[in-house]
From Swiss-Prot:
<dbReference type="GO" id="GO:0010273">
    <property type="term" value="P:detoxification of copper ion"/>
</dbReference>
<feature type="glycosylation site" description="N-linked (GlcNAc...) asparagine">
    <location>
        <position position="1151"/>
    </location>
</feature>
<keyword id="KW-0732">Signal</keyword>
<feature type="disulfide bond">
    <location>
        <begin position="388"/>
        <end position="525"/>
    </location>
</feature>
<feature type="glycosylation site" description="N-linked (GlcNAc...) asparagine">
    <location>
        <position position="892"/>
    </location>
</feature>
<feature type="disulfide bond">
    <location>
        <begin position="410"/>
        <end position="560"/>
    </location>
</feature>
<feature type="disulfide bond">
    <location>
        <begin position="697"/>
        <end position="709"/>
    </location>
</feature>
<dbReference type="GO" id="GO:0042802">
    <property type="term" value="F:identical protein binding"/>
</dbReference>
<feature type="repeat" description="11">
    <location>
        <begin position="1512"/>
        <end position="1513"/>
    </location>
</feature>
<dbReference type="GO" id="GO:0030277">
    <property type="term" value="P:maintenance of gastrointestinal epithelium"/>
</dbReference>
<feature type="glycosylation site" description="O-linked (GalNAc) threonine">
    <location>
        <position position="1290"/>
    </location>
</feature>
<feature type="glycosylation site" description="N-linked (GlcNAc...) asparagine">
    <location>
        <position position="1227"/>
    </location>
</feature>
<feature type="binding site">
    <location>
        <position position="529"/>
    </location>
    <ligand>
        <name>Ca(2+) 2</name>
    </ligand>
</feature>
<feature type="disulfide bond">
    <location>
        <begin position="367"/>
        <end position="384"/>
    </location>
</feature>
<feature type="repeat" description="3">
    <location>
        <begin position="1424"/>
        <end position="1434"/>
    </location>
</feature>
<feature type="disulfide bond">
    <location>
        <begin position="571"/>
        <end position="616"/>
    </location>
</feature>
<feature type="disulfide bond">
    <location>
        <begin position="717"/>
        <end position="739"/>
    </location>
</feature>
Length: 1513
């Protein structure tokens, strides 16, 4: 049994070797790196190393495709003044339209010198102490040490498309670079061909020089350095011999005393780090020392992203290769705030608005008290009142910060107590211009003391208490009223309500409530519960989608008509008003105006938009403009920032119009001084309210009781505080009133003589002597909660006592009152479904809803538009990569995920779009870019399962931990989080705590007002420059505005009418115009279509399906997927919820449905009812296969398992069946003279065996012999002798290489197909393999298509040949690889050959695969080598094995005599002896420790050749 066992062990060792070489080859091909270093050494993408001492300008690496060239890298080397060491003088990089010129000190982009870091369109240039780096989204990264070393890494899509000193990147060493069409080039000849000839520049080519005869004296030292313990992790990753030879050459050429080996050692370290290794510090004080600034230390391998005081967690998210350089000592971070070097985290300062704060320093900011702790603010909330504002007659901001615009025409409940009628605040909105779209706040009504007292504040400045005018100040038991300036009235109450009423230039209201009222109020000002998301809570208890739908439910008079949302922008309707508005309103944003002092405290963006809106919409432009500017000044004063002098250049007519003896002041904080206050003493005067501006009495002066701050204009008519001149017209409900002879004469606009529908009755106020309803009582279902506020008789149809108006023209009892949601009526008892699993039921006009927690969504779309998880809309045009959301927040430094958005400019205006998304989950990185996903395994982190699938136009990534990312493959990303993440995330998407007011929480935990401060704090790398402003692309491209507004008007048009009541279109329309103006360098239609699609998607989620695409407007071509004469694929604007997929059949269900996504969906026929998302076709159930996480295994295919003695297979019922793999050998070891091995038993158990090791002696043959030992794999090098002999003379044996897989073409439709050839790889391959590109496990023969795969033409698949072969009758996507063979004399390495000095017997990693012979069954067979799988059938036999192989050593022509080889189980040097007499080879191996004697030639390059095995009976 000994001999068969020895053979078995030998075969297993060969298989292990072959597998290892295969993996190394694959690992190398993934690196895609070319480099140059030291004394003119170059390494190509394919792994060739050569020396070329050229000093001209050379093409280092370029895209050499004929159709379109994306990049080129040129370099120029020079010698130092002593003429010894060479260095790179300059690097010239061209990437698409950008040209970058680098020298030791400068970086020049497109002719302009730039500072680093430099960011532009898809380009980053940065410097550190050791390197200059260039990154491009085109798929290129470059690293230069500003001395002698340059490294370029390319994306895999450039394979077989490059030229230059870096070679053609085809995966074949030497081929096409040093060997082309049978002609061999030297390194000098190859290098000279890459010369860049410049006009008027003469540069001599280097000539061939005689290499030194021997550098072997340096081998031992170079091997010692490169195999030291510092490089222990590198030995299996990088071919050491290549760098040993380079090191030997460097030392040979080195002047006396020079440290010339440093460059090669450093390059070896860089290549090791790039391959995933971790070289340790090999430098010493005497060997290539390096110095670092400050207290930094030099490390050979560290994360290129330094943790800093402002970015504490970035190193854990770094996706780049480790590198050498200066780093902070362990336990410290770099202080990028004060620049004090490396410090402990506890000593990090904090930064706020440009000011530095020491650790432990406290500040009080608005409603927070914060302390600086380790570079982060630790804050706690303070009891803080909140303010609701009604500005400009239509703009409302709730207590919780929600902003909306509503043009009303009625009395509305602004705020009232939720559980009783102790107080209520009403506001009268009415038309004040020529149209009903210009509305003003006319009256504010305070009902207090359980509505026993009614206080009305008129826009003219008068105050009425229970319809009797009172003079100010006025003090009552529960409230007091004062007039601190000519512009303002202030009201203070005993129940925590404070009012600030602005009178000039238009009436505006600011309502403040103490924290004690939180959650106790309702009305247009919201419910004051800290959650902006439910501020549109109607009087019926349901959250509405739009402002008008919400406000209409809070009418205080049932006779008022519902108002619609006005979606038009008033500015385009009047160009003169628009220009006027832009000129003056832009003062709010300019940095040189007084308003700039407040930008950090109050973001001017929203005020600027309101200012333009009101100025364009107002009949008196200046008054509305000044009101808007004063609103911003008031907001600043409330934050403690006084805008002194802002009226000096604008809105100054009132400053100089103060009545005699009064002066204008910006910070009035006390009551007016009146003659009455002298006689009575205003001890009750309110003090300490927010500063107001206006005319007031100077110190030591008083106002008499007849004085007026605001002069009254001469009025012919007076009506409810409004003075009307003769001929003026006012619209009042359904009446048109004209001022004539000092009286209002009113005419019904709608005839009231019509018949009311029963049971309503007609009320004609002209036929009543009096109708006064002083006690509020409900008259409609909508005013049940708001209650009724009646000021005058209104003619029309009303319900009789005991019945309520149901809003649909009928009268019902209270129990039958319907409910309203999104402007639709629902009868009492009806239920509707909301969001995830919540339902609402209508009961007596109010909604009763369940409150289950749901997923929340963050949206990033277009050019920098964001909607946070809590619903906050904002814009941020950053130019770098930013944290969208992560759970590395607060003190949590061990988060589980991070999602990064990469922004690049999408035009010349400075606007950016999200072009790529990086998802870090556990130990995996997913990158969504260029319409596909790339998966990369990180070196740290645990495995987190995830699945990806295409749904319609979108790619969906679902992580098992409750994260869903939906990407439209362009610029739109939706991120959904499970409720378990609530309050535990941070980033540009906010903190997911249902409160929008703290969504702008920076990385250092401070809540800021500016979207710029917020966005800048979440940049991924601290080197990214801050954004100083958000550009307005329509102002920069005014010629595009009209086109953008015309195209985007579809969002406000009737096309989306069904959605307007469910999703507010205004913000999406603004975003659409913004994006359509910004995309001015191509893709403008794509920007527009993406913007409209974003609104359409929100409509679909709100169950408002809109068919908006047409053949002329953003069409989607689904028929592309249909085979000829079939119509299976269709466009679905709102997704498809009806079909089953193979994934659902396998039990893979999404945690949340995404079937609402628009796109192309199949309608599967009955015989193929299931959709296979991976194959993208309809199949029957038995064709689905099996799924493990995101990987599909076809029916009948093998399924991997962790059980080493089990083999698993996928059945046609999508089940995975596992069976014991009986007899499988799984492990072999040797301990002294004993050999141990393990096999699989019949029931899947592991059976152990051992015996005394017996060596094998293979009889000589007439062809070749193969001898191996059974030495332990893990501890002893494997000694293998492969010798070719001949009875007469030696023959030349070819050497062969398998190419990388080639997939240059992809299937086309129509009369096309798929073709792959081996052009530029080799002219006459020996063999070819073809397989499916999308599923490499499938051979081309398994796909059932009519395909040619041969060495004559490559692969040819024609669509016309596929009739009857499948549903689509289209070719699949294939890839090929070929086996290229060359005469032995051309297979020399491009490294200078070594001498016959003995080398270590430890097997060195090779740079291309080697195929060794296998033992075959008792038959004759010819086997072609592969690098992916080696299958061997082993049969016990005592017959000798005859095989023809090629040597793994360098080519020799010799006659070999019998050789005795003795191998010990311990590493020992090898002694080579060659005799010139021909005879067979006899090899004897024993397990005794002794030197090894073998016949071998010096190794110069790895060789693979075909193996033919013949076994005699």
């Amino acid at each position: 049994m000994g001999l068969p066992l020895a053979r078995l062990v030998a075969v297993c060792l060969v298989l292990a070797l072959a597998k290892g070489l295969e993996l190394q080859k694959e690992a190398r091909s993934r690196n895609h790196v070319c480099s140059t270093w030291g004394d003119f050494h170059y390494k190509t993408f394919d792994g060739d190393v050569f020396r070329f001492p050229g000093l001209c300008d050379y093409n280092f690496a370029s895209d050499c495709r004929d159709s379109y060239k994306e990049f080129a890298v040129h370099l120029k080397r020079g010698l130092d003044k002593a003429g010894g060491h060479s260095s790179i003088e300059s690097v010239l990089i061209t990437i698409k339209d950008d040209t970058i010129y680098l020298t030791h000190k400068l970086a020049v982009v497109n002719g302009a010198m730039v500072s680093t870091p430099h960011y532009s369109s898809g380009l980053l240039i940065e410097k550190n102490d050791a390197y200059t780096k260039v990154y491009s989204r085109a798929g290129l990264s470059l690293m230069w040490n500003r001395e002698d070393a340059l490294m370029v890494e390319l994306d895999g899509r450039f394979q077989n498309h490059t030229c230059g000193l870096c070679g053609d990147f085809n995966g074949m060493q030497a081929n096409n670079e040093f060997l082309s069409d049978g002609i061999r080039f030297s390194a000098i000849e190859f290098g000279n061909m890459q010369k860049i000839n410049k006009p008027e520049v003469v540069c001599e080519d280097p000539e061939e020089v005689q290499e030194p005869e021997s550098c072997s004296e340096h081998r031992a030292e170079c091997e010692r350095l490169l195999t030291s313990t510092a490089f222990e992790d590198c030995q299996a990753r990088v071919p050491v011999e290549l760098y040993v030879l380079a090191c030997m050459h460097d030392r040979c050429q080195c002047p006396q005393g020079g440290a010339c080996e440093c460059s090669t050692l450093a390059e070896f370290s860089r290549q090791c780090s790039h391959a995933g290794g971790r070289p340790e510090n090999w430098r010493t004080a005497s060997l290539c020392p390096k110095k670092c600034p400050g207290n930094m230390v030099y490390l050979e391998s560290g994360s290129p992203w330094l943790d800093t005081c402002s970015h504490l967690e970035v190193s854990s998210l770094c996706e780049e290769h480790y590198m050498d350089g200066c780093f902070c000592p362990e336990g410290t971070v770099y202080d990028d705030i004060t620049g004090s070097g490396c410090i402990p985290v506890s000593q990090c300062h904090c930064k706020l608005h440009g000011h530095l704060y020491m650790p432990g320093q406290e500040i009080t900011n608005d409603c927070e008290q914060c302390v600086c702790n380790a570079g982060r603010w630790m804050c706690k909330d303070l009891p803080c009142p909140e303010t609701c504002a009604l500005e400009g007659g239509s703009h409302i901001t709730t207590f919780d910060g929600k902003k909306f615009t509503f043009h009303g025409d009625c009395y509305y409940v602004l705020t009232k107590t939720k559980y009783n009628d102790s107080y209520a605040l009403l506001g009268e909105l009415a038309s004040c211009g020529s149209t009903d779209k210009q509305t003003c706040l006319k009256t504010v009504v305070l009902l207090t003391d359980n509505k026993k007292n009614v206080v009305a504040f008129k826009s003219g400045g008068s105050v009425l208490l229970n319809e009797m005018e009172v003079s100010l100040p006025h003090v009552a038991a529960s409230f007091s009223i004062f007039k601190p300036s000519s512009y303002h009235i202030v009201v203070n109450t005993m129940f925590g309500l404070r009012l600030q009423i602005q009178l000039v230039p238009v009436m505006q209201l600011f309502v403040t409530l103490d924290q004690s009222a939180q959650g106790q109020v309702q009305g247009l000002c919201g419910n004051f519960n800290g959650l902006e998301s439910d501020d549109f809570m109607t009087s019926g208890g349901m959250v509405e989608a739009t402002g008008a739908g919400f406000a209409n439910t809070w009418k205080a008079q049932s006779s008022c008509h519902d108002k619609l949302d006005w979606l038009d922008d008033p500015c385009p309707l009047n160009i003169e008003s628009a220009n006027y508005a832009e000129h003056w309103c832009s003062l709010l944003k300019r940095s040189e105006t007084p308003f700039a002092r407040c930008h950090l405290a109050v973001d001017p963006t929203e005020y600027y938009k309101r200012c333009k809106y009101d100025t364009c919409n107002c009949q008196n432009n200046e008054d509305c403009m000044c009101a808007a500017l004063s609103s911003y000044a008031r907001a600043c004063a409330a934050k403690g920032v006084m805008l002194w002098g802002w009226r000096e250049s604008v809105c100054n007519k009132d400053v100089h119009a103060c009545p005699s003896s009064q002066i204008f002041m910006y910070n009035l904080t006390t009551c007016q001084q009146t003659c009455r206050s002298i006689s009575e003493g205003d001890t009750h005067c309110l003090k300490g309210f927010a500063p107001v501006e206006g005319c007031g009495c100077p110190d030591h002066t008083f106002m008499d009781e007849k004085g007026r701050c605001v002069p009254l204009s001469k009025c012919s008519c007076y009506h409810h505080g409004l003075y009307l001149e003769a001929g003026d017209v006012i619209l009042r409900q359904e009446e048109r009133c004209i001022c004539r002879n000092g009286r209002l004469q009113c005419t019904q606009v709608k005839l009231i003589g019509h018949t009311c529908l029963s049971p309503q009755i007609l009320v004609d106020c002209n036929n009543l002597t009096a109708l006064a309803i002083r006690e509020p009582r409900p008259t409609s279902c909508q005013t049940l909660v708001a209650r009724y506020y009646h000021t005058e008789c209104i003619s029309g149809c009303v319900c009789p006592d005991g019945l309520l108006d149901n809003g649909r023209g009928g009268c019902v009892v209270e129990d039958e009152c319907p409910c309203i949601h999104n402007k639709q009526f629902y009868d009492s008892g009806k239920s509707i479904k909301l969001d995830c699993n919540n339902t609402c039921t209508c009961q007596k006009g109010r909604w009763e809803c369940t409150r289950y927690a749901c997923h929340s969504t963050c949206s990033i779309y277009g050019s920098g538009h964001y909607i946070t998880f809590d619903g906050k809309h904002y814009d941020f045009d950053g130019h770098c990569s930013y944290v969208a959301v992560q759970d590395y927040c607060g003190q949590n430094s061990t988060g589980s995920f991070s999602i990064i958005t990469e922004n690049v400019p999408c035009g010349t205006t400075g606007v950016t779009c999200s072009k790529a998304i990086k998802i870090f989950i556990g130990g995996t990185e997913l990158k969504l870019v260029d319409k596909h996903r790339v998966v990369k395994q990180l070196e740290e982190g645990h495995h987190v399962p995830f699945i990806t699938r295409e749904v319609g136009l979108y790619l969906v990534v679902e992580v098992s931990s409750g994260i869903i990312v939906i990407w439209d493959k362009k610029t739109t990303i939706f991120i959904k989080l499970d409720p378990s993440y609530k309050g535990n995330v941070c980033g540009l998407c906010g903190n997911f705590d249902d409160q929008t007011k703290n969504d702008f929480t920076t990385r250092d935990h401070m809540v800021v007002a500016s979207e710029l401060d917020f966005g800048n704090s979440w940049k991924e790398a601290s080197t990214c420059p801050d954004v100083s402003h958000n550009p307005d692309p329509c102002s920069l491209n005014p010629h595009r505005r009209s086109w953008a507004e015309k195209q985007c008007s579809i969002i406000k048009s009737d096309v989306f009418l069904a959605c307007h009541g469910k999703v507010d279109p205004t913000v999406f329309y603004d975003a659409c115009v913004h994006d359509s103006c910004s995309c001015d360098t191509g893709g403008d239609c794509e920007c527009f279509c993406s913007a409209v699609a974003s609104y359409a998607q929100e409509c679909t989620k709100a169950e408002a399906c809109v068919f908006w695409r047409t053949p002329d407007l953003c069409p989607v071509f689904c028929d592309y997927y249909n085979p000829p004469d079939e119509c299976e694929w269709h466009y679905e604007p709102c997704g498809n919820r009806s079909f089953e997929t193979c994934r659902t059949l396998n039990g893979i269900h999404s945690n949340i449905s995404v079937s609402y996504l628009e796109g192309c969906y199949p309608r599967c026929p009955e015989d193929r009812p299931i959709y296979d998302e991976d194959l993208k076709k309809c199949v029957s159930g038995d064709k689905c296969g099996c799924y493990i996480e995101d990987t599909r295994y076809p029916p009948g295919g093998s399924v991997p398992t962790d059980e080493i003695c089990m083999s698993c297979t996928c059945t046609n019922t999508s089940e995975i069946i596992c069976r014991p793999d009986e007899g499988k050998i799984i492990n072999q070891t040797q301990d002294g003279i004993f050999c141990y091995w393990e096999t699989c038993g019949s029931n899947g158990t592991v059976e152990k065996h051992f015996e005394i090791c017996v060596s094998s002696t293979l009889s000589p043959t007439s062809m070749t012999s193969f001898t191996t030992t059974s030495t332990p794999i893990s501890t002893t090098p494997i000694s293998t002798t492969i010798t070719t002999t001949s009875a007469t003379a030696t023959t030349t044996v070819p050497c062969c290489f398998w190419s990388d897989w080639i997939n240059n073409n992809h299937p086309t439709s129509g009369n096309g197909g798929d073709r792959e050839n081996f052009e530029h790889v080799c002219s006459a391959p020996e063999n070819i393999e073809c397989r499916a590109a999308t599923d490499p496990k499938l051979d081309w023969t398994e796909l059932g298509q009519k395909v040619q795969c041969n060495v004559s033409e490559g692969l040819i698949c024609n669509n016309e040949d596929q009739y009857g072969t499948g549903q689509f009758e289209l070719c699949y996507d294939y890839e090929i690889r070929v086996n290229c063979c060359f005469p032995m004399e051309y297979c020399l390495s491009t490294v200078s050959p070594t001498t016959s000095t003995p080398i270590s017997s430890t097997p060195q990693p090779t740079s291309s695969p080697t195929t060794l012979p296998t033992t075959s069954p008792l038959t004759s067979s010819a086997t072609s080598p592969t690098t992916s799988h080696i299958t061997s059938t082993v049969s016990p036999t005592t017959s000798p094995t005859t095989s023809t192989t090629s040597p793994t050593t360098s080519p020799t022509t010799s006659t070999t005599s019998p050789t005795t080889s003795t191998t010990s189980p311990t590493p020992s040097p090898t002694t080579s002896t060659t005799s010139p007499t021909p005879s067979p080879t006899t090899s004897t191996t024993s397990p005794t420790p002794s030197p090894t004697t073998s016949t071998t030639s010096p190794t110069t390059s790895p060789i693979t050749s075909p193996t033919t095995s013949t076994t005699s009976p």
